[in-house]
């Protein structure tokens, strides 16, 4: 779904800058640019530490080791300060927290219940 407000705003900028030089419709170019730019921000953008903490808090995970946070009464390995990931951890959760994107064919962070990468994923 294309955001028409963005398309119209982009068309207006094109008309203001290039209308006297060109005589074609800018609609196709604007739609193409908006579609390509929205692909990068389908999930949650941002690579800052604040963005990572925000995504981890949304999932209820630790930013450093990707374990469930707050932990259970028997949790001893995650203190949120000096913890590190274990031998194997959920790579989908790591990718979402660190980069803000969902790997594979999953679309929402609420579907992080599997283990590792989806079948057919090239690493």
UniProtKB/Swiss-Prot annotation:
For this protein, the record's InterPro entries field holds:
Carla-bd
GO function term, MF aspect, one: zinc ion binding
Q: Which domain of life is it from?
A: Viruses
Zn finger regions (C4-type) covering which residues? 62-83
Region Basic, as annotated, extends over 52-55
Is DNA-binding included in the keywords of this UniProt record?
A: yes
Keyword list, A-Z: DNA-binding, Host-virus interaction, Inhibition of host innate immune response by virus, Metal-binding, Suppressor of RNA silencing, Viral immunoevasion, Zinc, Zinc-finger
GO BP field: regulation of DNA-templated transcription; symbiont-mediated suppression of host innate immune response
Q: What is the role of the protein in this entry?
A: Suppressor of viral-induced RNA silencing. The potential mechanism of action is based on sequestering siRNAs.
Q: Which family does it belong to?
A: Belongs to the carlaviruses nucleic acid-binding protein family.
Q: What is this protein called?
A: RNA silencing suppressor
